[in-house]
């Protein structure tokens, strides 16, 4: 009976409890159903709730506001009771996942938590022992039921990378106990990945070296193939890592490695293996500062040859031709690129060059430059000093010998004489100065019964040198009668007579020496020329006919000694000039094969003519070369046309070793070449406009000259604006026949050897097989017309020399200048026909140009016809030595200063076979003026008349002015050469040799 009420109470409490739990479950159901799959152990009608989270921020049921009923209704359990709870563990995972790179992957871990557990934490993801915080996306889902709650943690990676490889686990804390899931291994497979690639190295020629390549998977294994210059080195692969041993190389090569696995292959970067060579010569050698005994040399190191420069050597030698030629060598470190050369003589000229060394060897020396030391104080005192007392004049006579010129260290100004007089208790110090020509002096006696100490020093503009060793002289008591200032000394002074007699004897001796030297010189000449004169002829002092006969005989003997044929000797009678009639002056310019010198040629009437003399540099000439040289001179002597340069003569000079050296004598033209004239019209600070009528006149002049040469079967082969000269009346004449040849058989000439040629002026058929015809000169004339129309621009801007043949072969030609008439461009374009037979002759070209010139109106007035302010040749001496013009590229040939007819190879041309591309070369433009050219500018052209209706062509040079004054290269993405119409880009067209 007692238990019945108790059981009834328990049943009532149980009913109340179940009702409260159901009501709580009704509150925590989510509003939206779960769309994903349900755990297999849960009823299908359960509605879970889930919480997305990142960085391990897991939400427990209590945190989401949807706690399980057991968590709110179950009373607190004691520690002893918690130990009796059933164990909690994660369900088994998928274990291992293998997939390829860039794929997506999802995996999860799940756990059931009974209601009896009150304290639970969220699930966190761990990879390789480190908790994942914020780097990946995960979602935690909760599925509550009557017995507890099921928790599923989803983890996803959208595009897996190799870095996602690893072991993933879930962790959770339940009642302060950590629960860990089984690991999920994720393996990402893909192409091999390089952990070490080959590296570029610089090696010595034929020396072994190693290259290393290492790559990893997964999948493994990874096999390595080596590639050299796009060809496999090993037929059988090697397992990674692989080391390739190369026995040695003789030239540069590119190596790479291929890594293969089941997914494919990966190719490493290509590395270049460079062969160490000797360095290039230093460039830009300059003298930064000079003193009396030192010079400061600077230079820019050349290419190091893939090996660091170790040290440099500065070589210095005296520039004086009379010096012994000894070279002083100064070694210094490679950096800094400066060195002060000391222990030099003052006021002296030196030649300086620099060479540098790496581990392979020494570079070639840089071009020699000239350095001069300044004037300094003398290094020595006068020599042989003697002092004696002249009692008759009461003076001290002091004599000395001048120090050696090389020890004077400057221009001698005079001497300073210091004389100190000392007597008992008295001392007086005086000094005198003597002019530079003196070697003796008189000093009045200042004291008697005293001692005079004399010292002498040399004076130059650089200062006063050291005094000589002192010379003492005793002055005795004075016992003679003092004369008044107006008195004369007593007679009997024989020393003055001795001086006069000595001077007379000296003059007689000098005259005798001069006479003997002239006699010896005459005898040497007679011996040299084979005794051309009889004894009677040699007695004639003034007889022009006899001297002329002597010259002809000397020429005949010289030609006979050279072995020249008799027929050629007859042709050269009026061409070869006696060497004694030619006086050489300064050097105007130097080329690779010759130099141009200023000279004076004596005429028959006793006057002299200023000429230009072109000499050949070679030290030795074969008989065939001499005959070719003289034969061409004999042919060109007959040229008689106002638009063709005239040959004045040829001279054969015998060196001290008896080697004949030919020289060509040509008219001296101070106004220079046509290219320079046109260039200055465009690049001056205030550009000058040249009327179109004047430009056409230039073209007509050249066409007339070439028509004359063509009619005489002469090929020029180097026709360009730089080889056309301007006479004093501004008439253009064709010059520089250094490449010209006479053609006798047929109408062509084939060049038999590789020579330097002006590539951008050469016809397409000549570039192909080196065959030249008169139509090849027509092609060059078309390019010259384009030069004139563009006021001196370089043809084919942006196109390199080695690209010219392909450029022309594809039909490209020079574009029409912007201010060029259509009719004029049609004429020049006809000169560039691919078929030489389709090109017009020079006669047709001359007629077309004259007709076009006549159709144009006259220039507006004579004042509008100007001469360009070009510097005179005389004022340009030393121009090539200026450092600011070291990179000058204006296609100016030093030989084009004069009209050259030499048979030697022309300078200022480029080999067609050369394929070097100087991408960093810059082009500089000369600016400057000269008063003499300004005077010429006031004189109109002789052939152009002014008219009231004349129209001055529009000046369009603003586009071709300063914006084109520097060289530009063609980087990737630049316009094609066809679009670069007016770029003044030399691109290595010619080699300027000065």
From Swiss-Prot:
Keywords: ATP-binding, Cell membrane, Disulfide bond, Glycoprotein, Immunoglobulin domain, Kinase, Membrane, Nucleotide-binding, Phosphoprotein, Proto-oncogene, Receptor, Repeat, Signal, Transferase, Transmembrane, Transmembrane helix, Tyrosine-protein kinase. Its EC number is 2.7.10.1. The modification Phosphotyrosine is found at residues 744, 748-749, 867. Autophosphorylated on Tyr-744, Tyr-748 and Tyr-749 in the activation loop allowing full activity. Autophosphorylated on Tyr-867 leading to recruitment of downstream partners of the signaling cascade such as PLCG2. ATP binds at residues 588-596, 610. GO terms for biological process: apoptotic cell clearance; cell migration; cell surface receptor protein tyrosine kinase signaling pathway; establishment of localization in cell; lymphocyte activation; natural killer cell differentiation; negative regulation of cytokine production; negative regulation of leukocyte apoptotic process. Residues 582-852 form the Protein kinase domain. Pfam families: fn3 (PF00041), ig (PF00047), Ig_3 (PF13927), PK_Tyr_Ser-Thr (PF07714). It is a single-pass type I membrane protein. Residues 24-77 are annotated as: Disordered. Residues 55-66 have a biased composition (Polar residues). It is found in: Cell membrane. The keyword Transit peptide does not apply. Residues 281-376, 381-478 form the Fibronectin type-III domain. It is linked to Defects in Mertk are the cause of retinal dystrophy (rdy) in the royal college of surgeons (RCS) rats. Interacts (upon activation) with TNK2; stimulates TNK2 autophosphorylation. Interacts (via N-terminus) with extracellular ligands LGALS3, TUB, TULP1 and GAS6. Interacts with VAV1 in a phosphotyrosine-independent manner. Interacts with TIMD4; this interaction enhances TIMD4-mediated efferocytosis. This is Tyrosine-protein kinase Mer. The gene is Mertk.
């Amino acid at each position: 009976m007692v238990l019945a009420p108790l059981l009834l109470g328990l049943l009532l409490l149980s009913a109340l409890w179940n009702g409260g739990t159901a009501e709580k479950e009704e509150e925590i159901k989510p509003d939206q159903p779960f769309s994903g799959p349900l755990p297999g152990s849960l009823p299908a009608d359960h509605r879970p709730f889930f919480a997305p989270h990142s960085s391990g921020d897991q939400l427990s049921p209590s945190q989401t506001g949807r706690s399980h009923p057991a968590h709110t209704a179950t009373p607190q359990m004691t520690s002893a009771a918690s130990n009796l709870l059933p164990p909690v563990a994660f369900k088994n995972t998928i274990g291992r996942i293998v997939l390829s790179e860039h794929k997506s992957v999802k995996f999860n871990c799940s756990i059931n938590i009974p209601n009896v557990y009150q304290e639970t934490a969220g699930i966190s993801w761990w990879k390789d022992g480190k908790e994942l915080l914020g780097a990946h996306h995960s979602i935690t889902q909760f599925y509550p039921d009557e017995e507890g709650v099921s928790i599923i943690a989803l983890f996803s990676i959208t595009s897996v990378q190799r870095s996602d490889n690893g072991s993933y686990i879930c962790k959770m804390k339940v009642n302060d106990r950590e629960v860990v899931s089984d690991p999920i291994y994720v393996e990402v497979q893909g192409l091999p990945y390089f952990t070490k690639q080959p590296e570029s190295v610089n090696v010595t020629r034929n020396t072994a070296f190693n290259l290393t390549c290492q790559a990893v998977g997964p999948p493994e294994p990874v096999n390595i193939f080596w590639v050299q210059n796009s060809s496999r080195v090993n037929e059988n692969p090697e397992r990674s890592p692989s080391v390739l041993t190369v026995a040695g190389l003789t030239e540069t090569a590119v190596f790479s490695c291929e890594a293969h696995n089941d997914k494919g292959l990966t190719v490493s970067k290509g590395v270049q293996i460079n062969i160490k060579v000797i360095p290039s010569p230093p460039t830009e050698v300059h003298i930064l500062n000079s003193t009396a005994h030192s010079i400061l040399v600077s230079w820019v190191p050349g290419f190091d040859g893939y090996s660091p420069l170790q040290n440099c050597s500065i070589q210095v030698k005296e520039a004086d031709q009379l010096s012994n030629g000894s070279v002083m060598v100064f070694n210094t470190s490679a950096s800094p690129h400066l060195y002060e050369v000391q222990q030099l003589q003052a006021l002296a000229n030196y030649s300086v060059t620099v060479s540098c060394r790496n581990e392979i060897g020494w570079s070639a020396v840089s071009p020699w430059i000239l350095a001069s030391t300044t004037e300094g104080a003398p290094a020595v005192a006068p020599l042989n000093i003697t002092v004696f007392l002249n009692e008759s004049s009461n003076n001290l006579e002091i004599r000395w010998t001048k120090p050696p010129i090389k020890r004077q260290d400057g221009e001698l100004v005079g001497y300073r004489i210091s004389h100190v007089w000392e007597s008992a208790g008295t001392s007086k110090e005086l000094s005198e100065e003597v002019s530079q020509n003196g070697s003796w002096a008189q000093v009045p006696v200042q004291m008697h019964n005293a001692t005079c100490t004399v010292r002498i020093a040399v004076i130059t503009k650089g200062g006063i040198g050291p005094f000589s060793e002192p010379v003492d002289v005793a002055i005795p008591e004075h016992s003679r009668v003092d004369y008044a200032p107006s008195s004369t000394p007593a007679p009997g002074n024989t020393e003055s007579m001795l001086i006069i007699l000595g001077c007379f004897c000296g003059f007689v001796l000098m005259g005798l020496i001069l006479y003997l030297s002239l006699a010896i010189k005459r005898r040497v000449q007679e011996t040299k020329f084979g005794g051309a004169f009889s004894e009677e002829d040699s007695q004639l002092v003034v007889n022009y006919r006899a001297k002329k006969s002597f010259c002809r005989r000397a020429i005949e003997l010289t030609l006979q000694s050279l072995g020249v044929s008799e027929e050629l000797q007859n042709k050269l009678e009026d061409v070869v000039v006696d060497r004694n009639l030619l006086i050489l002056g300064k050097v105007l310019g130097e080329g690779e094969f010759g130099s141009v010198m200023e000279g004076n040629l004596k005429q028959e009437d006793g006057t002299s003519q200023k000429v230009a003399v072109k000499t050949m540099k070679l030290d030795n000439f074969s008989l065939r070369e001499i005959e070719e040289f003289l034969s061409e001179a004999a042919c060109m002597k007959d040229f008689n046309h106002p638009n063709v340069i005239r040959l004045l003569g040829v001279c054969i000079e015998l060196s001290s070793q008896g080697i004949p050296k030919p020289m060509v004598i040509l008219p001296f033209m101070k106004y220079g070449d046509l290219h320079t004239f046109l260039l200055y019209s465009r690049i001056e600070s205030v550009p000058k406009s040249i009327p179109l009528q004047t430009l056409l006149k230039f073209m007509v002049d050249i066409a007339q000259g070439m028509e004359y040469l063509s009619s005489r079967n002469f090929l020029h082969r180097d026709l360009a604006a730089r080889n056309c000269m301007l006479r004093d009346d501004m008439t253009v004449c064709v010059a520089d026949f250094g490449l010209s040849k006479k053609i006798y058989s047929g109408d062509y000439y084939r060049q038999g050897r590789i020579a330097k040629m002006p590539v951008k002026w050469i016809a397409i058929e000549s570039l192909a097989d080196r065959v030249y015809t008169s139509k090849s000169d027509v092609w060059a004339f078309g390019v010259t017309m384009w030069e004139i129309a563009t006021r001196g621009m370089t043809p084919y801007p942006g196109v390199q020399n080695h690209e010219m043949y392909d450029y022309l072969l594809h039909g490209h030609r020079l574009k029409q200048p912007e201010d060029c008439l259509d009719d004029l461009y049609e004429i020049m374009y006809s000169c560039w026909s691919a078929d030489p037979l389709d090109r017009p002759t020079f006669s047709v070209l001359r007629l077309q140009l004259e007709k076009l010139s006549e159709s144009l109106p006259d220039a507006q007035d004579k004042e509008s016809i100007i001469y360009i302010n070009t510097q005179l040749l005389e004022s340009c001496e030393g121009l090539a030595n200026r450092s600011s013009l070291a990179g000058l590229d204006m296609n100016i040939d030093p030989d084009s200063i004069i009209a050259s007819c030499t048979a030697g190879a022309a300078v200022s041309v480029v080999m067609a076979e050369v394929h070097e591309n100087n991408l960093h070369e810059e082009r500089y433009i000369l600016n400057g003026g000269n008063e003499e050219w300004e005077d010429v500018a006031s004189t109109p052209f002789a052939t152009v008349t002014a008219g009231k209706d004349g129209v001055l062509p529009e000046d369009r040079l603003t586009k071709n002015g300063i914006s084109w004054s520097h060289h530009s290269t063609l980087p990737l993405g630049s316009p094609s050469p066809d679009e670069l119409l007016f770029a003044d880009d030399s691109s290595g067209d010619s080699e300027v040799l000065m």
